[in-house]
Amino acid sequence: MKQLYTVPFERNSERVKELRRQYVQRVMELEANQAPHEFIYIDEAGFNLAKRRRRGRNVIGKRATVDVPGQRGANITMCAAIANAGLLLHRCQVGPYNTERLLAFLNDLHQRLVPEQGQEGENMRTFVITWDNVAFHHLQAITTWFEVHPRLVSLFLPPYSPFLNPIEEFFSAWRWKVYDHQPHDQMSLLEAMDAGSRDITVDDCQGWIRHTRRFYPRCIDLDNIRWLAMAGGRLTSHSGLERYQRALRSVGKSRRPSASRYKAALTNQPEGRRRS
């Protein structure tokens, strides 16, 4: 028996695949445009004191344990924006983000990106805000804000497509860094969240953005894309993970596992035979 993964039936529907293709085409059109522009990726993620690493090391014969507070405390939500220049802005708030908090975040981001207020023109850099296509981002107040700030434009991601949003990997890596600080109360949790964000480098963000673009050809071809979030924040396909797991099980059954035996199992070839 194998572990079952829940897969939304619409995740690779014709409608979703067409929306992915349209999104990639829009990105390519912006890239081909001579007007200077920059893609900004925005999302929100929550955290509380009850969250910890689910695996750890232990002394032989003893359980691997970790101390946690007796109460989980209030959820803290962080809204963040990343680009090729790295982490541009992040704001932590107790409780969920509402319209007022999101507008305040956009205003702070606008002041950071467009310090010269009132300047407009054909050759001015445009900032493409790329985020999830959720109802919260379609509110009239948000739409009006973008109309008042023409240097920032909104681009919505297709549904069921986290592999196209590099900030998903940012939040995954950031969570592990927060776990390592082992916060014990709300104040230390806020400090750990800020410290974890500062540990994210420009190279990290650039690598995540490049990784999402590896899926563009498959979106253009309307392929079915199956993915799974792995440790370290890397989104990959189910097929690659299943091949990796089969190789581990095959080598684990051997009395004398070796690197060559593992490589042979991973490539589905007999041990000792070289690939032509």
Name each model-derived stretch.
Residues 17-108, 220-223, 227:
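Extended, low-complexity cationic-aromatic segments
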Residues 102-127:
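Short, basic/hydrophobic alpha-helical segments
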Residues 131-133, 140, 155-179, 187:
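RNase H-like two-metal-ion nuclease catalytic core shared by retroviral integrases
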Residues 1-3:
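Major-groove recognition helix of helix-turn-helix-like DNA-binding domains
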Residues 40-46, 80, 106, 129-134, ...:
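Short, conserved catalytic/metal-binding motifs centered on acidic residues
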Residues 63-71, 148-166, 183:
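RNase H-like polynucleotidyl transferase catalytic core
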Residues 36-39, 167-276:
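C-terminal anion-handling pockets and recognition modules
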Residues 139-149:
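Short, aromatic/basic amphipathic alpha-helical patches
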